Amino acid sequence: MGARRYVRNRDTSLTAPIRCRTYALFSALLASPHDLETGAPLCDAGWTDEVRPYGIDLAGLGSAYAGTGWRSQARDYSALFEVGDSGPPVAIREQQQFKDLPGVREELVRFYEFFGYLLSERYAWAPDHLSVILEFTHFLCYRESSARRDILSYQLAQLDFVSRHLINWTPVLVERIDAARPGS
């Protein structure tokens, strides 16, 4: 049996499930409220305590969001990410962020297809939506946590994907959200 390869100093059995659930939560938080099932819990406190050492209160974040009510969530989401005379005030889709960079959506779809991630027809029109990108990252973490071999391929895929499709534009997204809705 060959040696197992993995990213140095990463205990996959501990970190992959936490990363997996965290990406799933952020995907749900950034999805359009019009697409979410109302009343579905965003997270349970059982696993969110595991990320407290990193200074993140995910249970509080999920509870605060759920406490705002669906109508308010839908109105605020639409005003920030969907409605605008010349497009949305803040682009939550990667291709909108990089209008001068062709092929973003195609590259995303190639990633999805290579790893067997299938978008339902409902979301196929927006493979570059931030919630879909986060859900795919959740999918890669899940595959890493459940893999018996080739763990490194999922870890490196996460690194490559996050570098290409999250790190490069989410800081700009955060700045634009803060400018449009200070303190949100």
Regions found by a protein language model. Give the residues of each.
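Surface/interface-facing alpha-helical segments and adjacent flexible terminal/loop regions used
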Residues: M1-S184
